[in-house]
Amino acid sequence: MSVELAKVSILGKECVHVGYQIHEHIVKSTLEHCKSSTYVIINDTNVSKVPYYHDLVSLFEKSLPEGSRLLRYDVKPGEAHKSRETKADIEDYLLLEGCTRDTVIIAVGGGVIGDMIGFVASTFMRGVRVIQVPTSLLAMVDSSIGGKTAVDTPLGKNFVGAFWQPQFVFVDIKWLETLPQREFINGIAEVIKTACIWNGEEFARLEANAETFLSVVNNSQTVSVFSPHHNETVELTYTNIESMLEHTYKLVLESIKVKAHVVSSDERESGLRNLLNFGHTIGHAYEAILTPQALHGECVSIGMVKEAELSRYMNILSATQVARMVKILAAYGLPISVNEKWFKELTLNKKTPLDVLLKKMSIDKKNDGSKKKVVILEKIGKCYGTSAHVVSDEDLRFVLSDETLVHPFNNIPEGQNKVITPPGSKSISNRALILAALGKGTCKIKNLLHSDDTKHMLNAVQQLKGATISWEDDGETVVVHGQGGSTLTAPSEALYLGNAGTASRFLTTVAALAKKDGKNDHVILTGNARMQERPIGPLVDSLRSNGLKIDYLNRQGSLPLKINTETNFKGGKIELAATVSSQYVSSILMCAPYAEEPVTLSLIGGKPISQLYVDMTIKMMDAFGIKVTTSTTEPFTYHIPKGNYINPAEYTIESDASSATYPLSFAAITGTTVTVPNIGSASLQGDARFAVDVLRPMGCEVTQTATSTTVTGPPRGQLKPLKHVDMEPMTDAFLTASVVAAICNNGTTNTTTIEGIANQRVKECNRIEAMVTQLAKFGVRANELPDGIQIHGVNSISELRQPSDAGIETYDDHRVAMSFSLLAGMVNSDKKDDESSVRILERQCTGKTWPGWWDVLHSQLGARLDGAEPSTTKSSEVKKSVVIIGMRAAGKSTVSKWCAESLGYRLLDLDEEFERQYGKGTVKDFVAESGWDEFRKEETRIFQEAVDKYGDKGYVLSSGGGIVERSESRQALKRFAESGGIVLHLHRDIEETIVFLKSDPTRPAYIEEIRDVWERREKWYHECSNFTFFAAHCSNEIEFRNLRHVFSNFIRRVLGAEKIPVPSRRSAFVCLTFEDLSDHLSKLDEITYGCEAVELRVDHLSSFSSDFVTKQISLLRAATKSLPIVFTVRTVSQGGKFQDDDYDLLESLLKVALKNAVEYIDLELTLPNNILYNVLNKKSNTKIIGSHHDFAAKFPWDDAEWENRYNQALSLDVDIVKFVGTAVSFDDNLALEKFRSTHTLKPLIAINMTETGKLSRVLNNILTPVTSKLLPSAAAPGQLTLAEINQLYHQIGGLPAKKFFVIGSPIGHSRSPILHNTGYELLGLPHHFDKFETEDIEVVKKELLTREDLGGLAVTIPLKLDIIDSMFELSEAAKTIGAVNTVIPLGKNKFRGDNTDWLGIKNSLVSNGVPSSVSGSAGLIIGAGGTSRAAIYALKQIGCDTIYMLNRTTEKLQKLKSEFSEEYKIVVVESAEQTESIKEQVSVAVSCVPADKPLDPELLNKLERLLAKGTNSSFKPTLLDAAYKPSVTPIMKLARDKFNWNIVPGAEMLVHQGVEQFSKWTGAKPPFKAIFDAVTQE
């Protein structure tokens, strides 16, 4: 196949040549027209892998004339190398090769190469000739045309460059064959852009060919080819360009023509050329945030939609044109919103804050100073004016946000008179599409509503092959080519209908007419979450009774539906309950002519709802050739004959009468005039009566002809309430009437009563309830009636209340949003200069029926609008609750209490809530009386109510074991998890559970074996939960406390209450390669000494079952005190043991990791994209390490492989990059360090394996993989212990030896030296800790604070206060406690004073079973000395509500209390009698009195009374004695023996405060157990 070679002129020269397979033409033209001694082909290493590149180079070499030479230069790929440094490297190469001014440079590549090499050519030898050979679609149509060249700088893209026109641009379509699919689609954005601004005909051609294009590109394949340049087989994408060659050639050529024309008219971008930036002002702002995950064209696509919406908002571009643009971008596979699910996943759910977008937009070359300029469209193919226009931040904010601020309508002039034409009726549009699709012949439908609903309907009609659709009149007319229903067939994919209720009901019956297509023997209708709650049951029941097989795939009575195509629509007598929705009636009516027999449709259950809509359907069927007759003998019965619709040549949709109520009501409330020119008394729609039946009685002047309606409102504040109005003929309009009624008051009454609207409870939301709820925010009282609403209007407009910043909920309901947009503007509208505003949420939902409503309200009716980010008030109030599920006896009740205490949440036990509501006994009693099935139904109801009420309010909901038994409960659990809630599966070993349950008589008995119950439920627990915690069996109190501690850390990390930051200093993790950790638990603590994390090599485990792996994670956490886990499944090709291609098992293991909330997942960058993105989008608070290993020593550190993988890691936005090479020579370590120094955008772990590579491990900065002497072998060649790394680092000068001292007097018995020196020795640190005894601070200043090798000071009495004056800064703890026990050098003779005594107290308590948050409990402190101050601070930090203090004398305590703020809630206990009034649980105590003196009897009496108040604590009450000799003090003995308190010796406090010092000084993680043992041994 071939196409003709086209030549396009730029600046008077035919220099752009476009064709297919034009290598010979490229070489011939270059050698003929650009004679030179030296030709240099410059490309990136990705292009040099393509065989077509080698064909070009080979042909060039063969064709060179004598005396000429060809040089080639490869650069590293990617935007990161479009830099001044790369440019300099290229120039140095050219100079070294002796290139002179006659050199011709040929740039072969995408936009990065074209831009950069063009800039090289413009400056080398003050300018040499350049030829562009673009290889990507984006480069072909954009960057290669026009002579703009540049490189990036750290401050921005393309900031340094020049205009330098190429001699030729050779555009060879053949290059696109190997362009990756996403890059291909990325380039299409620029093609569509040029058609939008200049070429309407080409836009229409692009529309017509979209399906073919996307089909070809999406079916591209990966092929293996040999690359001579790389001497290896490489994988490339192959797209069958020849199958759409004419279309591709044309789209490239036409796009180039537009840009060439514009460039020729305005080469230096002074005016016309900036039209080429349509979509780029906003698109570039998105790109700046979303790069590198999002591509340029993807962001420009979103930018085009936003800038088109801005044009519509300014009343310049029609809604139809915007709809066409949105449709074509989506049709070519481009994103149209940052909120599209696939695009959000691709960009890893990055946020695009409004203020950041505006800031990015302010840095744009089109701007006029601080004024932002945007290209405005007039219509498809034509811009508004000849350059970009200045737009306000206010308008930009509106377009960019989904929340609207409506300012008071105090700017609307009296006497304003407007003509507003609402879009086509949704009801008529949807019916017309169904009738035309079922009809025979071509029908041109005019004024069709372009909305989400009709978009879904059009797509569905085409998917069902019911008709072909085309467009005329710039998209204003839809042309339906109907086939009389004969071609309806089942599609291979589900019909997605969003929240389009009308479409779902009409299409249910249409789908029943479809025939089987090959293997496709059913049609699935589905929609969004709200659509899957809306009712469709009566229609389905009716169709089922007529012989059709229809299944619900989720909840009964709602979508999704599965409609079998092998059963037929029989017809005959059909009965239908029509008291809920008239759309059920219309659905059967419209499809009835295609039943096997004539249909008699009887509506049962009472008077049908919305009769006027049924009449509308019948009248429209008549217009399409089928006459329905109403029975004269049976009520609400219709006879429909068999037949085919005959499509009228043209059908015009009248405007939507429901939508017309909004501008007409605007006139009513503002005292102005509005005319709707195409809705009058002859309308098919019941809502056309709104002005006459509602607004006129309210006091408006109404003029209505057969085809138009005009409303003039009375002076503001003079509308009258309606005593009663039946809105059954126009139910959708009740919302508009309600907001108008909110400001109605005739002086004697203010109550409006609306009835006949019961069906509004099952629309997009329960609209009656929504209206009552939201009106209340304006201070308007309303109440529900059985089939209506009563509104009690305010006495005057000035009484309308300003809603809070949380805003007005719209419930994703277009009519709620539009109605409240009117009332919002009336708030403060009586105050002339008031700038307040009312926030309306989810404004985009108006796209369902009137996408341009806000534009009309703003640009035509004159309202002032602004946009806003979602309110922080609202998001800060949301505390996602935790639902705990699991088998009976898994420990849910206990763990739920732990959970609530750890998070500061409230606890609701759902079984207890059931018993409270039941009121007649226990669950066991109810089951005995009513059976399990009834209990399960009630359980579901109570759970759903609890989630609705408490789901965002910080609750722990503890469920019964069988909550997963009912499908409805499972769906509710899944929905809660999908909405961001935590559904935690608490799991225990099933064997232990069985033993326990068999011995517990208090629970209702299972009617089957416990193991069978578990096997049935197991999969449900897994599928309903988004997190899992395995609670190991505890055989003693210590294990139980440890489990609580581990769980507390786990749940706080899940909720983000405890963050695990990526280390910013030297750190390590130890690698475990055991088959089963349970055999090595006693050694794990010591193995992990000094490490910030521990790697679980899952590929080495003996089993990959999810249960086994979950247990291993649990064991590891318990044994290492919740040390962060690196979860690694290393594949064989990356040096591990896991099979390379077992992706299903790998995905299941990664899912286990995510559900167990491991702190890190090592994700190999060679894995398929779908696995990578799946993990990245579900990672929650888990950090991702993107890793790549080169075991074969195939890639030196300057190879493009590492660069490509680094760019890949950046695009995936992993948290840490981990690269492991293999050192062959010592120089490989130096090459690695050079790579490390230039790759600093992400934390980087970079090491070399083998003995030769050990230096790289020593020099690595963060999370270096290490081994331990206690492990049988290292996990990788050359791996070192942490101590070895530190010793080597010291020896090469990286870790200078420091001196540390404890200062004060007396310190002869101080354990600090042994504490710290033990840690230094174990971790291989070169430091030494000694005693320095003195009482004189001046000696300390002179002899210690001046030492250059000083690492830190531990300060004890009497210097804790004296040292403060020598400190440059103090920590918050030191300031509050008023003492310093830790001195940290800051450099330059400056020091920071800190206090770790409080951490010694806090961590001693927490490590002995006290929750990290004890909210609801009180604390107790005995003593008034210096340690008491630290104790006060510590107890406040763990959340004690009140702190009680005891001492022999209270004077010191009163002074101490006065030195702390009231928020500490310190209560000095003066007498024993005072303790009687204390009602709180006293659960935590710290003794700060000497242990070598007997306690005062009165103090002892008060102490005993307070210790007695710990008996009902939710955790075991715990006392710490700060004295560490003797090991059990008298107070400890009293608390333990008499009051059953848990006791903690002072030695633990000593060690805990000491290891905190150790960590602050060295940055290393101290080996706690070894230090503790060393300190406490006598």
Curated annotation (Swiss-Prot):
GO biological process: amino acid biosynthetic process; aromatic amino acid family biosynthetic process; chorismate biosynthetic process
Stored InterPro entries: 3-dehydroquinate_DH_AS, Aldolase_TIM, Aminoacid_DH-like_N_sf, DHQ_synth_AroB, DHQS/DOIS_N, DHQS_C, DHquinase_I, Enolpyruvate_Tfrase_dom
Record region (EPSP synthase): 406-863
Sequence segments annotated as region (Shikimate kinase): 882-1071
Active-site residues, Swiss-Prot/TrEMBL: E269, H284, C845, H1189, K1218
SUPFAM superfamilies: Aldolase, Aminoacid dehydrogenase-like, N-terminal domain, Dehydroquinate synthase-like, EPT/RTPC-like, NAD(P)-binding Rossmann-fold domains, P-loop containing nucleoside triphosphate hydrolases
Record localization: Cytoplasm
Keyword Chloroplast: no
Pathway: Metabolic intermediate biosynthesis; chorismate biosynthesis; chorismate from D-erythrose 4-phosphate and phosphoenolpyruvate: step 2/7; Metabolic intermediate biosynthesis; chorismate biosynthesis; chorismate from D-erythrose 4-phosphate and phosphoenolpyruvate: step 3/7; Metabolic intermediate biosynthesis; chorismate biosynthesis; chorismate from D-erythrose 4-phosphate and phosphoenolpyruvate: step 4/7; Metabolic intermediate biosynthesis; chorismate biosynthesis; chorismate from D-erythrose 4-phosphate and phosphoenolpyruvate: step 5/7
UniProt: Zn(2+) binding residues: E190, H280, H296
Span list, region Shikimate dehydrogenase: 1297-1578
Binding residues for NAD(+): 44-46, 79-82, 110-112, 115, 135-136, 157, 175-178, 186
Cofactor notes: Binds 2 Zn(2+) ions per subunit.
Cofactor: Zn(2+)
Reactions the enzyme catalyzes: 7-phospho-2-dehydro-3-deoxy-D-arabino-heptonate = 3-dehydroquinate + phosphate; 3-dehydroquinate = 3-dehydroshikimate + H2O; shikimate + NADP(+) = 3-dehydroshikimate + NADPH + H(+); shikimate + ATP = 3-phosphoshikimate + ADP + H(+)
Family as reported in the entry's similarity comment: In the N-terminal section; belongs to the sugar phosphate cyclases superfamily. Dehydroquinate synthase family. In the 2nd section; belongs to the EPSP synthase family.
Quaternary assembly: Homodimer.
Protein's name according to its UniProt entry: Pentafunctional AROM polypeptide
Source species: Kluyveromyces lactis (strain ATCC 8585 / CBS 2359 / DSM 70799 / NBRC 1267 / NRRL Y-1140 / WM37) (Yeast)
Species classification: Eukaryota, Fungi, Dikarya, Ascomycota, Saccharomycotina
